[in-house]
Amino acid sequence: MFNIRNTQPSVSMQAIAGAAAPEASPEEIVWEKIQVFFPQENYEEAQQCLAELCHPARGMLPDHISSQFARLKALTFPAWEENIQCNRDGINQFCILDAGSKEILSITLDDAGNYTVNCQGYSEAHDFIMDTEPGEECTEFAEGASGTSLRPATTVSQKAAEYDAVWSKWERDAPAGESPGRAAVVQEMRDCLNNGNPVLNVGASGLTTLPDRLPPHITTLVIPDNNLTSLPELPEGLRELEVSGNLQLTSLPSLPQGLQKLWAYNNWLASLPTLPPGLGDLAVSNNQLTSLPEMPPALRELRVSGNNLTSLPALPSGLQKLWAYNNRLTSLPEMSPGLQELDVSHNQLTRLPQSLTGLSSAARVYLDGNPLSVRTLQALRDIIGHSGIRIHFDMAGPSVPREARALHLAVADWLTSAREGEAAQADRWQAFGLEDNAAAFSLVLDRLRETENFKKDAGFKAQISSWLTQLAEDAALRAKTFAMATEATSTCEDRVTHALHQMNNVQLVHNAEKGEYDNNLQGLVSTGREMFRLATLEQIAREKAGTLALVDDVEVYLAFQNKLKESLELTSVTSEMRFFDVSGVTVSDLQAAELQVKTAENSGFSKWILQWGPLHSVLERKVPERFNALREKQISDYEDTYRKLYDEVLKSSGLVDDTDAERTIGVSAMDSAKKEFLDGLRALVDEVLGSYLTARWRLN
């Protein structure tokens, strides 16, 4: 049986590849880029999938890794499924592409058990290890928390037949259609019992029940995505229980006193049993809970989002993370100074506890989507001052349900009237109204009519009309846009405006990739320049938001985009916003940002565009022989560099057969080959694009 363990490389990856660990974790970096791919109700599960994939826990099986990636893909809107790529170039190779089709995460699991996570130039390595040699009989069960054997092998021998009888009967009693799943689980339990593996993962096997007796020695039990209505008595030595995606599971049995981790999200739980005193990690999001039991003193992480809670119990002093968004909370209990992350967005909070101001400077607080007044927020800003606490909010206020109009009616308000004898342009949108997320897009169109742009910009209606015309002709772009609309129906005008900007950006990239600029290279470069400017502005906005104690990220981003629209020639950006005054962005910030973007573009755009996916697509169509020759050379360069590093680094250091060192030089060889590819591409791009790449801005 394979397990995963974290490893310390014998040769430092940073020393060979020159990579430094990012300030944010890989899953945080990736989530920021792909959040728009998912419906909001799937946010937490998608984030948990990412965390497990980036930091696999001991005991996770290769099949479970593959299923987690497939699950992540299934959680997206259909239009973004292709950005989550499974089994790419091999059996166990995966990657995630951002909205611009740029790779932001890759995960490789090879036959030797090497598990590598690559994210934005940083790599993290893990190993699969064999707990017992093939054919070797395990002489004792897994160690308990104290390091002692929970049960000797002689007891196993005496009890094995008894357990097998229970499991065999359970397998024979399977209802129609459930026999294959039960057979697989019985085999897994037998292997678990015979080999002493402490981890039992029953997988998504379509189970309606589990046998009355489980392997007694297990310390980790994983039961994902089945049809269970109840659980049997749990083994006394259980330390971790993960039971998720069982939508008929309404309650849990008594929990073992030594349980340290309980993940029971995406079920139908109406209540929780008494929690063990040593429980440190509790995740019960997306259930039907209306109240919580007393919290154990050892609790460090609490996730209760997506329930029907109106209040929370007293929180333990050691709590570090609390996620309780998407509930009905009207108040919060006192907060411990050690709390590092608090997310209570999308509740009904009208006031906040005084203890919130006593959190450490490293704390992050999310209050988005609560009916907090501007006066309350301003008072909070004055209180926290320069404490370093970062509080995120938005100007949306409480969510008010709003019924979507038929899509063709919402579209008709933006299109010009048909001439006599012509069919109304909006008529063809009746069929589009049956497509996924069409109702959300209808709401977006109606929300846009309430924005400052609609009220003050005479050309805004014509811009939207032109956009709708292309959407009507392009099913692929329409699907992506409709999917993005589900996150754009906020009651905050500026959030809808920001979402429109994101949709416009996707439109620009989509047009470039499908060939619109194959015969208009100047237009291709202009689109690339706009993407570069927006990316640079986003980084500037992120840095500015990081300096603000009370921050609405969207207002900060939108402030830079709107106010610099003309000076930076941003065609995808609108000219108006409502809440600039609460953004925290000053005139001097805007002046500095304009200069920073123009300077960066003059010096760095010609290098940046070499890695831009739409440019590669154009070159592959216009000069396929030369472009593909560069790709083939990249593969050859990788192989040559790997062999050279193997001889010069591994052999000379005595590290032959060291899998961590081999993986490290592999990353280094890949980076070297990519650099050679880009160097070769530069000459081709200079030849094809010519003067279009000269410095755009004249600076004093």
Swiss-Prot record:
Chief location category: secreted
Record comment: activity regulation: Exists in an autoinhibited state in the absence of substrate protein, due to interactions of the leucine-rich repeat domain with the catalytic domain. Is activated upon binding to a substrate protein.
This enzyme's EC code(s): 2.3.2.27
SUPFAM superfamilies on file: L domain-like (SSF52058)
Induction pattern: Transcription is maximal in the late logarithmic phase of growth. Expression levels are similar in the intracellular and extracellular environments.
GO terms assigned for molecular function: ubiquitin-protein transferase activity
Region span, Interaction with target proteins: 1-395
GO cellular component, one term: extracellular region
Extent of the LRR repeats: 217-238, 239-257, 258-279, 280-297, 298-319, 320-337, 338-360, 361-381
Documented effect of changing Y325A: Abolishes interaction with host PKN1 and PKN1-mediated release from the autoinhibited state
Catalysed transformations (reactions): S-ubiquitinyl-[E2 ubiquitin-conjugating enzyme]-L-cysteine + [acceptor protein]-L-lysine = [E2 ubiquitin-conjugating enzyme]-L-cysteine + N(6)-ubiquitinyl-[acceptor protein]-L-lysine
Function: Effector proteins function to alter host cell physiology and promote bacterial survival in host tissues. This protein is an E3 ubiquitin-protein ligase that interferes with the host's ubiquitination pathway and targets host proteins for proteasomal degradation. Can ubiquitinate ubiquitin, giving rise to polyubiquitin chains (in vitro). Polyubiquitinates host PKN1, leading to its proteasomal degradation. Down-modulates production of host pro-inflammatory cytokines by inhibiting NF-kappa-B-dependent gene expression; this depends only partially on its E3 ubiquitin-protein ligase activity.
Domain free text: The LRR (leucine-rich repeat) domain mediates interaction with host PKN1 and inhibition of NF-kappa-B-dependent gene expression.
Subunit structure, as described in the record: Interacts (via leucine-rich repeat region) with host PKN1 (via the second REM repeat).
Name of the protein this chain belongs to: E3 ubiquitin-protein ligase SspH1
Organism taxonomic ancestry: Bacteria, Pseudomonadati, Pseudomonadota, Gammaproteobacteria, Enterobacterales
Gene (name only): sspH1
